[in-house]
């Protein structure tokens, strides 16, 4: 039987443990710029997927995704041991690491929304000077014409 609430609690706890272990216990310079963004658990609580993002050393620098992935791969045993010790469950879940693509997707979505806003502003400018083709209100009827007919 799947207990989604327990899986969610365990995922949140694993996220906290892994993030603090990377920050405080694992001494690898390639892990300095990693942020753990989310953890998902399977229903049987045997597998956890850890999502992470990597930022560059400086604001304008490109992140080194391969080095970060290699560092996480090399530290996976130590991280699993730390998670097992701090989690206190019978079976320590297997940890799989995946790059989180949500920031890139949201940046792309923001760019699309900005483009739509610019087009709306252009249309609003065109609409200000627009004149209807024909009568200003084609549905308005002149009552005098109807009375004479």
Curated annotation (Swiss-Prot):
Statement: the UniProt record of this protein carries the keyword DNA damage: no
Q: Give a GO molecular function annotation for the protein.
A: ribosomal small subunit binding
Protein origin, superkingdom: Bacteria
List locations, semicolon-separated: Cytoplasm
Family annotation (InterPro entries): KH_dom-like_a/b, RbfA, RbfA_dom_sf, Ribosome-bd_factorA_CS
Pfam families noted in UniProt: RBFA
State the residue spans of region: Disordered.
125-149
Q: Name one GO cellular component term.
A: cytosol
Q: What does this protein do?
A: One of several proteins that assist in the late maturation steps of the functional core of the 30S ribosomal subunit. Associates with free 30S ribosomal subunits (but not with 30S subunits that are part of 70S ribosomes or polysomes). Required for efficient processing of 16S rRNA. May interact with the 5'-terminal helix region of 16S rRNA.
Under NCBIfam families, the record lists:
rbfA
The family classification in the record reads: Belongs to the RbfA family.
Q: What is this protein called?
A: Ribosome-binding factor A
- Organism in which the protein naturally occurs: Corynebacterium efficiens (strain DSM 44549 / YS-314 / AJ 12310 / JCM 11189 / NBRC 100395)
